[in-house]
């Protein structure tokens, strides 16, 4: 597997673009991904029960088949909690995109992100979709078109050889606030020219989402709009992937790398964030316990504010472990911050405070927890909690 310079349109047969339709003041706010042939597809969605209209429309597209040829996305407006009219507007986005690209209606996925409760300005949406062209575009413009409070574009591309063919996989994501997936306010789109059955792609996506996107948190809020969509159009012409083979393992590793990079990028770009926090939990009896404990630690407001202030207060970490719901032995926990052991057998060690203080000034803080009761592990990612987070969200609509 090789990291390559690319974008969401790098896999063979894909195109992407973004335009300014006027939903936002300056930046691009409507974008699309298009495959020149129908692609096997998979998707996962927010677990928030107040799901936005685009979620229902995309689910409807998947009802008749697991194929997509286009994804239409707008930012600046979530089209959530907008009643029957919001549903009609999302359906209209799908229909207009299908007509413009001359593809079947159910080959189009719809995604929206932005302010909840406002009606879509359909005159602007319609004008934006009319700018669509089948096989032209600038992928960087698409990356910008899906952003809201993000401070940078998030994308990655890898290549590997499968069945004697070069296979490319690219991913792009947005997300900065309201991030606490199962899923959260994040959109992620992954394209690949690999040939893989849709059922296997869906199974793999769920496994990898649980390891990556569902292990990030910024503020504990789960959004109404999140989705991850994967399109595999087979244009690399590799032999159809089969589970349990060496080629499938290579594909799965590449999938993991793409999704982990995007997940960490979202956590790093949390609203107002100055530091990425990574929590690694080892020695658990179950993977689920390790992941649960890691995520509780990285979700703790007290841990997040300590990271912001450069305070190595391990009491906040052990407290989060205690209420995590995961299994552990209270008298046998080891905690390291940046490789510096500060807790052993659940008692404070003698450590170099100056070295710890210096480490906590870095932009990537790693907390290692060993439970010493098993062999399973899990990782979660988040960010610190700064004054800027409050400022951004206190004035979001203004």
Swiss-Prot record:
The active site is at residue 185. It holds the Pfam family ArgJ. Signal peptide: none annotated. It catalyses: N(2)-acetyl-L-ornithine + L-glutamate = N-acetyl-L-glutamate + L-ornithine; L-glutamate + acetyl-CoA = N-acetyl-L-glutamate + CoA + H(+). It comes from the Bacteria. The keyword Transmembrane does not apply. It is found in: Cytoplasm. Its EC number is 2.3.1.35, 2.3.1.1. InterPro entries: Arg_biosynth_ArgJ, ArgJ-like_dom_sf, ArgJ_beta_C. GO terms for cellular component: cytoplasm. Its main location: cytoplasm. Pathway: Amino-acid biosynthesis; L-arginine biosynthesis; L-ornithine and N-acetyl-L-glutamate from L-glutamate and N(2)-acetyl-L-ornithine (cyclic): step 1/1; Amino-acid biosynthesis; L-arginine biosynthesis; N(2)-acetyl-L-ornithine from L-glutamate: step 1/4. GO terms for biological process: L-arginine biosynthetic process; ornithine biosynthetic process. Substrate binds at residues 148, 174, 185, 271, 393, 398. GO terms for molecular function: glutamate N-acetyltransferase activity; L-glutamate N-acetyltransferase activity. PANTHER family: ARGININE BIOSYNTHESIS BIFUNCTIONAL PROTEIN ARGJ, ARGININE BIOSYNTHESIS BIFUNCTIONAL PROTEIN ARGJ, MITOCHONDRIAL. Catalyzes two activities which are involved in the cyclic version of arginine biosynthesis: the synthesis of N-acetylglutamate from glutamate and acetyl-CoA as the acetyl donor, and of ornithine by transacetylation between N(2)-acetylornithine and glutamate. Heterotetramer of two alpha and two beta chains. Belongs to the ArgJ family. This is Arginine biosynthesis bifunctional protein ArgJ. It comes from Listeria monocytogenes serotype 4b (strain F2365).
């Amino acid at each position: 597997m090789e990291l390559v310079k690319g974008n969401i349109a790098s896999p063979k047969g894909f195109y992407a673009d973004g335009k300014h339709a006027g939903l936002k003041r300056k930046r691009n706010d409507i974008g699309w991904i298009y495959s020149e042939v129908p692609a096997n597809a998979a998707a996962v969605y927010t677990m928030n029960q107040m799901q936005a209209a685009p979620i229902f429309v995309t689910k409807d597209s998947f009802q008749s088949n697991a194929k997509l040829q286009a994804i239409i996305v707008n930012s600046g407006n979530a089209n959530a909690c907008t009643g029957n009219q919001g549903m009609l507007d999302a359906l209209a986005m799908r229909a207009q995109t299908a007509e413009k690209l001359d593809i079947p209606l159910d080959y189009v996925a719809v995604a929206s992100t932005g302010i909840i409760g406002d009606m879509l300005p359909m005159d602007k949406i319609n004008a934006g979709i009319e700018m669509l062209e089948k096989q032209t575009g600038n992928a960087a413009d698409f990356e910008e078109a899906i952003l809201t409070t993000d401070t940078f574009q998030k994308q990655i591309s890898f290549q590997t050889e499968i069945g004697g063919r070069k296979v490319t996989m690219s991913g792009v994501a947005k997300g900065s606030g309201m991030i606490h997936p199962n899923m959260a306010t994040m959109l992620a789109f992954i394209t690949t020219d690999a040939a893989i059955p849709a059922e296997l792609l869906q199974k793999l996506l769920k496994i990898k989402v649980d390891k990556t996107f569902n292990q990030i948190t910024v503020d504990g809020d789960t959004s109404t709009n999140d989705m991850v969509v994967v399109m595999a159009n087979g244009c690399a012409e590799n032999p159809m992937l089969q589970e349990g083979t060496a080629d499938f393992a290579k594909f799965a590793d590449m999938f993991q790398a793409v999704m982990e990079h995007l997940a960490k990028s979202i956590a790093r770009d949390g609203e107002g964030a100055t530091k990425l926090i990574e929590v690694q939990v080892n020695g658990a009896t179950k993977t689920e316990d390790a992941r649960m404990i890691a995520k509780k630690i990285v979700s703790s407001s007290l841990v997040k504010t300590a990271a912001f202030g450069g305070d190595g207060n391990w009491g906040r970490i052990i407290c989060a472990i205690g209420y995590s719901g995961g299994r552990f032995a209270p008298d046998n926990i080891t905690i390291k911050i940046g490789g510096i052991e500060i807790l052993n057998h659940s008692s404070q060690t003698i450590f170099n405070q100056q070295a710890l203080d210096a480490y906590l000034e870095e932009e990537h803080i790693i907390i290692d927890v060993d439970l010493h009761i098993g062999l399973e592990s899990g990782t979660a990612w988040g960010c610190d909690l700064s004054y800027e987070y409050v400022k951004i969200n206190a004035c979001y609509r203004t």
